[in-house]
Amino acid sequence: MALLLFGLAAAAEIGGCFAFWSVLRLGKNPLWLAPGLVSLVVFAWLLTRSEATYAGRAYAAYGGVYIAASLVWLWLVEGTRPDRWDLAGALLCLAGAAVILFADRSP
């Protein structure tokens, strides 16, 4: 469930940030900022639904998913295929996120 939640949060965050990127860097219509803001609010709300006990741990685990999702965005939306270094870095980050997320923390 955590990975699905983080995946949805990543889609909302990346979409929201890309709306700002589109306006400020690509000269798109400023009306794109409204759905961008809504998307960023949805992202923040989704991240609070995490089962993690501490916010910092949720953010750290989410970070790996965000990186992988950003590379999917790069490929599917921006039309640039991630290279082997992108993929290697994403795998390292996902491994770290898995350790943070699924580690047994019982005493």
Curated annotation (Swiss-Prot):
Membrane topology, from the record: Multi-pass membrane protein
Record's subcellular location: Cell inner membrane
InterPro entries: UPF0060
Signal peptide: none
HAMAP family recorded: UPF0060 (MF_00010)
NCBIfam families assigned to the protein according to its UniProt record, in alphabetical order: PRK02237.1
Protein name per the record: UPF0060 membrane protein glr4174
